[in-house]
C-alpha cells in the first residue's frame, strides 16, 4: 500500500485586487460564488480520505479576503477530518489590509499556528507602484494584533529589485523587518511573468528595474545582514530563526509528495504531478474526484532532475546516500563531472557526501541548476 502524503495545500483564488507582478491562479472576488467554492474545496479534500497531515498551507489568491464565517467553515471542516495530534504546522496566508479582528479570532481559535503576511515592501510609494493596497501602518497593526491573539510564528514576504527601488530602500525594508522581531522572512527578487501588468509594461519599455549587478548587490546585503542577526539562510529565498523554518515548504524542496486542493492548485501524488481546473466555475462543475485538468507521470529522468533542482535550493543540499537509495543509481556516474566543475567554480561544496550550494551558488542558482539536466541516453 502506497504511503499517503503528509502535506496538503489548499488554494483560495479570490483577491480584492490584482497585484501588478502576480501570475498565480486568482480572480477578483466581486460576484464570485465564494460559499459554493468553499463547499467544493471541502468536498475535494474529503474525497482523498485523509486522516493525518503533518503540514497544511492555505494560500492564494488571498485567503484573508474570506469572511470570518467562510474561513471558520473551511478550517472546521479540515480539522474535523484530521488527527490534530500529528499536525505540526498549519499556515494561512493573509494580506495586512484584510485582517479584521473577527478573522484573527477565527484563526486563533482554530488549529492554525502560523501566519504568512504578504508585505512585499514597507515603502508606501513602492506599495502603490506595484499594485498593493495596504500601507506600512497596516503591516505594524496586523502584526501587533496577531501577536496579541497568541501567534508567535509569523512570517512575511518581501520583494526586492522592484521598479525604481534603490539599495537604501532595500536596507530600510530589512531593517523594519528586524525591528518587528519576527522569526521568519521570505525575500524574493522580482521576476517578470507573462500575463502580468509589469510584463506588459516591460515589453513597452515602460518599466525601470535595477540592473543585474544591483540585484546581486541587494541579495548579498540581505544574506549578510540577516545572518548577522541570527537568521538561518536555509533556502535560496527563505530565512528563519532556529526552529522556525517552514516545514511545509521544506516538503516541496525535499521533493516529497503532497495534496493540491482547489481551483488551479498543483499536487504530487503517486509519482504524478497534477494541476486542477483553474477557472472557478469549471472547478465547481467537476465532481470532487474529477477536478484535474492535467496529469504528468514523471519519468525517472524527470524525478532525478527535480530532486537536484529542488534539493539544491536548500542550504542543506542533497545527501548522496539518500539520493542513491531513492533512485538506485550511482550519483558519481550521473553527476561526478558536473560536481567537480561546479566545486572548482566555487558554486558548490561537497561536505561529507552532502552536495550544497555556496553563497555564490545561491546568487547564480539557475547557472547551477542547468548543469543537472540529463541527456535521455542516461536511462
Curated annotation (Swiss-Prot):
CDD domains: Radical_SAM (cd01335). Residues 1-232 form the Radical SAM core domain. GO terms for cellular component: cytoplasm; plasma membrane. GO terms for biological process: porphyrin-containing compound biosynthetic process. S-adenosyl-L-methionine 2 binds at residues 61-62, 120, 132, 157. The keyword Glycoprotein does not apply. Its main location: cytoplasm. It holds the Pfam family HemN_C. Keywords: 4Fe-4S, Cell membrane, Chaperone, Cytoplasm, Heme, Iron, Iron-sulfur, Membrane, Metal-binding, S-adenosyl-L-methionine. S-adenosyl-L-methionine 1 binds at residues 9, 60, 93. GO terms for molecular function: 4 iron, 4 sulfur cluster binding; coproporphyrinogen oxidase activity; metal ion binding. [4Fe-4S] cluster binds at residues 15, 19, 22. The keyword S-adenosyl-L-methionine applies. InterPro entries: Aldolase_TIM, Coproporphyrinogen-III_oxidase, Elp3/MiaA/NifB-like_rSAM, HemN_C, HemW-like, rSAM. It is found in: Cytoplasm; Cell membrane. L.lactis does not synthesize heme, but is able to take it up from growth medium and to incorporate it into cytochromes. Might carry two S-adenosyl-L-methionine binding sites with only one binding to the iron-sulfur cluster. Could serve in the delivery of heme to a membrane-localized target protein. Binds one molecule of heme per monomer, possibly covalently; heme and Fe-S cluster binding are independent. Incubation with the reductant sodium dithionite increases binding. Does not have coproporphyrinogen III dehydrogenase activity in vitro, does not complement an E.coli hemN deletion in vivo. Binds 1 Fe-S cluster, it is probably [4Fe-4S]. The cluster is coordinated with 3 cysteines and an exchangeable S-adenosyl-L-methionine; only dimeric protein has the cluster. Belongs to the anaerobic coproporphyrinogen-III oxidase family. HemW subfamily. Homodimer. This is Heme chaperone HemW.
Amino acid at each position: 500500500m502506497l504511503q499517503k502524503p503528509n502535506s496538503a495545500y489548499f488554494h483560495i483564488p479570490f483577491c480584492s485586487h490584482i497585484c501588478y507582478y502576480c501570475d498565480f491562479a486568482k480572480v477578483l472576488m466581486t460576484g464570485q460564488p465564494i460559499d459554493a467554492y468553499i463547499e467544493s474545496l471541502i468536498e475535494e479534500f474529503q474525497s482523498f480520505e485523509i486522516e493525518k497531515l503533518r503540514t497544511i498551507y492555505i494560500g492564494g489568491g488571498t485567503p484573508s479576503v474570506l469572511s470570518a464565517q467562510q474561513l471558520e467553515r473551511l478550517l472546521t471542516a479540515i480539522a474535523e477530518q484530521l488527527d490534530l495530534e500529528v499536525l505540526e504546522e498549519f499556515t494561512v496566508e493573509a494580506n495586512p489590509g484584510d485582517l479584521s479582528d473577527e478573522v484573527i479570532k477565527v484563526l486563533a481559535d482554530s488549529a492554525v499556528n502560523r501566519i504568512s503576511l504578504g508585505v512585499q515592501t514597507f515603502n508606501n510609494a513602492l506599495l502603490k507602484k506595484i499594485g498593493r493596497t495596504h500601507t506600512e501602518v497596516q503591516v505594524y497593526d496586523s502584526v501587533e494584533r496577531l501577536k496579541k491573539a497568541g501567534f508567535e510564528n509569523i512570517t512575511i514576504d518581501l520583494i526586492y529589485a522592484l521598479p525604481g527601488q534603490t539599495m537604501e530602500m532595500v536596507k530600510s525594508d530589512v531593517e523594519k523587518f528586524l525591528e518587528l522581531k519576527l522569526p521568519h522572512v521570505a525575500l524574493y527578487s522580482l521576476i517578470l511573468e507573462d500575463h502580468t501588468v509589469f510584463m506588459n509594461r516591460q515589453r513597452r519599455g515602460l518599466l525601470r528595474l535595477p540592473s543585474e549587478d544591483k540585484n546581486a548587490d541587494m541579495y548579498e546585503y540581505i544574506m549578510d545582514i540577516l545572518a548577522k542577526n541570527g537568521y538561518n539562510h536555509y533556502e535560496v529565498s527563505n530565512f528563519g530563526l532556529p526552529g522556525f523554518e517552514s516545514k511545509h515548504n521544506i516538503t516541496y524542496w525535499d521533493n516529497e509528495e503532497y495534496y493540491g486542493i482547489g481551483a488551479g492548485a498543483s499536487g504530487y501524488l503517486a509519482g504524478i504531478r497534477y494541476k486542477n481546473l483553474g477557472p472557478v466555475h469549471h472547478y465547481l462543475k467537476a465532481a470532487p474526484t474529477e477536478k484535474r485538468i492535467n496529469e504528468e507521470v514523471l519519468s525517472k529522468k524527470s524525478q532525478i532532475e527535480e530532486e537536484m533542482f529542488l534539493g539544491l535550493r536548500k542550504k542543506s543540499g542533497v545527501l548522496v546516500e539518500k539520493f542513491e537509495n531513492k533512485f538506485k543509481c550511482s550519483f558519481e556516474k550521473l553527476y561526478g563531472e558536473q560536481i567537480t566543475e561546479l566545486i572548482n567554480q566555487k558554486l558548490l561544496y561537497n561536505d561529507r557526501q552532502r552536495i550544497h550550494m555556496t553563497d555564490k551558488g545561491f546568487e547564480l542558482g539557475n547557472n547551477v541548476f542547468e548543469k543537472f539536466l540529463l541527456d535521455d541516453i542516461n536511462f
